[in-house]
Amino acid sequence: MDAIQEAIDTVETLRKRITNISEDAMDLLFREARTHNAWTDTPVTDTQLLELYKLVINGSTSGNCLPARFIFCRTPEAKSRLIPCVNPGNVAKLEAAPVCAIIGYDTMFWEHLPQLFPHRDMTAQYRDNADHAETAAFRNGTLQGAYFMLGARAMGLDFGAMSGFNNKA
């Protein structure tokens, strides 16, 4: 069986087994979901972060491009390096959080497409057009960031999405 048919069969099997998620799960992920501004002092372990990463890394993107890159800052030293990058109103939130996840993207993601999307070579459209690669990386990395937040919540963790930072810092 080829990879495309195998993927189709996997989704069809899942759809037969799981027709929808519970109302409680929909509330948790969407209807009652809000960005948090305060944290408990409960630590988030490396095991939890790895589990979260594995849960969300293959979420659907255009052509399986998967450009997101994740950096986790947990120690006071790591967080102190971020302070110059965040707006003053976000410093206390950053310091109080058990972990800060930086979700970025790699504009050279296309180098991995032969493994991620093996049934069709899509590298030329990005290799030969840096602007297109940047746009695709931003768009699809943003999707992966959203998957990360939903995955965190599904695992019993929470997040405070932060856009108040200085890109030039």
PLM-predicted stretches and their roles:
Residues 1-169:
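Acidic, surface-exposed loops and disordered segments
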